[in-house]
Amino acid sequence: MALQTTNTWETLAQLLPSRNHDQDFWWKVTGRQLAVLLEAAGYPIERQYNTLLFHYHWAIPYLGPAPASGVAKWPSQLSVDGSPIEYSWKWNTKSKAPDVRYTMEPMSEFTGTKLDPLNQRAFRELLHKLSQFVPDVDLAPTDYFMSTLFDHDRSVLMKAVDDGVPLQFSSTALAFEFLDKGLLLKTYYAPRKLETGHFVLKDWDTAIRGYYPESKALDIVYEFLKTSPEGELMNPYHLAVDNVKDGRLKFYFQSPHRTFTSVREILTIGGRVQREGLEEQLLSLRDLLNALTGQSPDFPEDGEPPIVEEDVTADLDTDGHPELMSGYLYYFDIAPGAALPEIRFYVPIRRYCKSDLDLAQSLTAWMAANGRGTYCQQYLDLVHSLAEHREISKDRGLQRYIACLLAKNGEIEVTTYLAPETYEQVRRSQKTAV
């Protein structure tokens, strides 16, 4: 039976005061969803309370207006339906329990107006407040990239608002990772020049090198992009930083190819990554991808898994980058002093699965077969709970991405990204009421 609520949620729902219509809506919906995630992942009761109280006091006030209809006033690219939040479930390994995280695009009453045409005011305000509350938060990378990645001629932006130029693209986001060691903050940046459109690699390089002037790992990334046939096809689209001292930088790219041959080339950086057990990891990863995309174990490495159905909503969550749904996504994880980057890749899985139930069953079957089945039933119950507004045996889209990283310890790190579908829930309830 799907877990619809938890004891921690019920207790807090009774004790925490009502604030206003908007915040009460987001707390009722996302607070309960987060509570179910934490319970399913086996978080101790104390950490469940701490995480939910953090969400209530810090995130809820910045989720913007409650949906008055099924259409978002400022549709966030974090989700297909425009919801300003996305959850992630980092799967357990043989020795470690799952981790829960969520990413949000902070919003306010001024989002999209002449006062805040790019919706960055709430992002900066929330970060400033958190820096005074959360230990070890470092806003230096945020200050730097906000000053170098975006247009700052406000007169141009305000004129664009007056002229009706569509500026509704998500340019910043903030992630909270609730770990055993404490809270980790990450910030995301997706710049776009008003006159010329998206950044090209040269623009990114100028900005990144200003903050990371000496990086062997970054040098390797650029060398790969210039010399590998696969690297030459990759398109940069945003970056993220850990907001701690000497934090990592994550540089995101899209590849148009969906073959495992392409995946192998990029994850090994053209053969530059070499270590014992790597080939076994790659073969296990291939098995996982074949299972997730519904292919047989002998599906050729140079074959592209068929798309179940063209995604007509692709534009809604890719910041005008519809090509981001046409291939696989990657990021290069640049750590200070590292000789090589780590690489994580993402499959926009809703394009390849028959239904959310089929995907969840395929994923949990692979986990169980690889000695990681401890939380499989909890995950299946979680998917049912988040999708109480629709049939997961017929619909798809709740599970948006599957991300994988070949860890140095021989494990494959797997993360599922889940959509709250708040606007979709409103749309469906309105249809039912008619």
From Swiss-Prot:
CDD domains linked: PT-DMATS_CymD
- Binding residues for L-tryptophan: 86
Q: So, what pathway does this thing act in?
A: Secondary metabolite biosynthesis
- The molecule here is called Prenyltransferase fogH
Please verify whether the record's keywords include Transferase. Answer: yes
The record's section on NCBIfam families has: arom_pren_DMATS
State the species of origin.
Aspergillus ruber (strain CBS 135680)
Q: Name one GO biological process term.
A: alkaloid metabolic process
Give the function comment from the record.
The PKS fogA releases the carboxylic acid (8E,10E,12E)-3,5,7-trihydroxytetradeca-8,10,12-trienoic acid as its product, as well as derivatives with one and two double bonds.
